[in-house]
């Protein structure tokens, strides 16, 4: 039957049916007839709605699929096939906008022409029997019932069949075809006999007669009657039961379930060692932009043209020198690399026509910085398998690092508002259905809260850099291409702005596999003096390259301008994910949406407007040593976005492991707070699994510190 369903029905219908069965905890491998029934019901609901629209005069019209009038209002709103929360949101929205009475049970459709909810039934039995069952269950004259059978019969409330003859005939023909197809495969009889009546759930209903006798006979051993078994189930305490099952599994297994109390958990141990260092692919809060407003120069939009135009806005260049050397690098090479960039940009400006791309001369300093000819030679295994002492080269264990305050400062800065607008969402046409209206409203409110956020700047910067680097890696594999680090935004007044953060020079990039690495040197402008937090800049060589005049309360002040230079690397798969950083917006929007849904289901109406416009209400943002931090809904949006962005910027195996393992401990603590009396075994092993992920990654260490704050306040 399962194979038949997958062949016979549209994949979208099959997927919706799978979700519905999963939501109700039913196994489609076992309940195959139910699977077929759900697919049939979904298809009938969709066919009922298909091609029916309402024109500007409010009349119901039929439009064939090839007709271009796509913006006509659908006559029917489809409720069936949505998950329960979303379905109730749609129903509540319809009731609020049309004044319709709210139904007790979820209906299948809403008819905008007749202004009524519709319950669709598809039966393998007599239509009038099924109709009565539906009517008894719904107990509402406001919901219209329409029943179809596989034999071509139909029945509807007050013989009002809603649709025209032809539309109903299409549904009946399809049902008849499904029946024929099932019969030809020998599936029909089983399907026909498996239909149960409409189920109504009653509290502790009495079982009598034959059913009672069968219930008593089918109990597990040691139970004489149903009442005894019910009493046992109601008073069942799981402690001890799981140990028994485990001991049967293997002589090696010896698990004692320990009660998890408020005093049980200890804080996660963070590693000791030197402070952790910055490891993002580009500077975050310390970045400095050279910008042009309302760009209209020749070649505007071509990165190299934009970069040269931005460079011309700064007049404070001076002879560069190293102010913070890289401990292990050849620092003069970094200095020479920057001088080479300046010289080659000057050469371009002297040319008659500026080229679209710039490949750097392969000088000794760039060859060193980009690791040219540094990779160990690869030898075929067959040529060396006879060597007696052949072994994998030793690699050192990573050095443990401690949490440093700079990463919390980075996160705080990412949550802040800037004075620029970083995203503009495309127009997606007019809303037709209520659910689209709600979705657009939520999207617009959310965008307003995060469009000025610094985390959004990081998204656009990340998307640009990764796209440019991947393009160059594929288009100029052997060249040391100069790639400007650019972003675009709008000022508060709506003027366009192009920003230059610095440059990347790409090394050789013959990337065959997803994980093959391309080396690059990044050179980024900053006003941050690296000597204030030298541990943060361990991987960088920092040059002083100029003096910048800044406006301040006391007039103009001169500040030294620095260039942060380092060798770095990335891979095709990392660049691919970097290009998709806009997904962070979607993830945080979905988290906000689940908060709105929870609020809406309590109030039984869509709470989007109140949620965003009630400025007096505060929401929990996170834990800190002081306690639960709270803030406005805008602050919540920006914090969730910043977390998502940092998960992308600082993605690592350490983060994957910590997230997966700490989640288990979080669920146990949550169960304790919900008074579910959780029990655990091998809690020490869980702590070990969490703590082995705490090595040197700044973002993971910060998350572990936040987790400890949560433990402290959650278990008070």
From Swiss-Prot:
Cofactor binding mode and count: Binds 2 manganese ions per subunit.
Sequence motif Nuclear localization signal 2 (NLS2), residues: 184-247
Keywords: Cap snatching, Endonuclease, Eukaryotic host gene expression shutoff by virus, Eukaryotic host transcription shutoff by virus, Host cytoplasm, Host gene expression shutoff by virus, Host nucleus, Host-virus interaction, Hydrolase, Inhibition of host RNA polymerase II by virus, Manganese, Metal-binding, Nuclease, Phosphoprotein
Pfam family name, one: Flu_PA
Keyword Magnesium applies: no
Motif segment (Nuclear localization signal 1 (NLS1)): 124-139
Localization annotation: Host cytoplasm; Host nucleus
Binding site for Mn(2+) 2: 80, 108
Sequence positions that bind Mn(2+) 1: 41, 108, 119-120
MF (Gene Ontology): endonuclease activity; metal ion binding; RNA binding
Source taxon at top rank: Viruses
Changes after translation: Phosphorylated on serines and threonines by host kinases, including human casein kinase II.
Entry's Gene Ontology BP terms: cap snatching; DNA-templated transcription; symbiont-mediated suppression of host gene expression; symbiont-mediated suppression of host mRNA transcription via inhibition of RNA polymerase II activity; viral RNA genome replication; viral translational frameshifting
Cofactor(s) of this protein: Mn(2+)
Gene3D superfamilies membership: Influenza RNA-dependent RNA polymerase subunit PA, endonuclease domain
Main subcellular localisation: host cell
Major enzyme class: hydrolase
Described function: Plays an essential role in viral RNA transcription and replication by forming the heterotrimeric polymerase complex together with PB1 and PB2 subunits. The complex transcribes viral mRNAs by using a unique mechanism called cap-snatching. It consists in the hijacking and cleavage of host capped pre-mRNAs. These short capped RNAs are then used as primers for viral mRNAs. The PB2 subunit is responsible for the binding of the 5' cap of cellular pre-mRNAs which are subsequently cleaved after 10-13 nucleotides by the PA subunit that carries the endonuclease activity.
Assembly: Influenza RNA polymerase is composed of three subunits: PB1, PB2 and PA. Interacts (via C-terminus) with PB1 (via N-terminus).
Record family assignment: Belongs to the influenza viruses PA family.
Identification of the protein by name: Polymerase acidic protein
Gene: PA
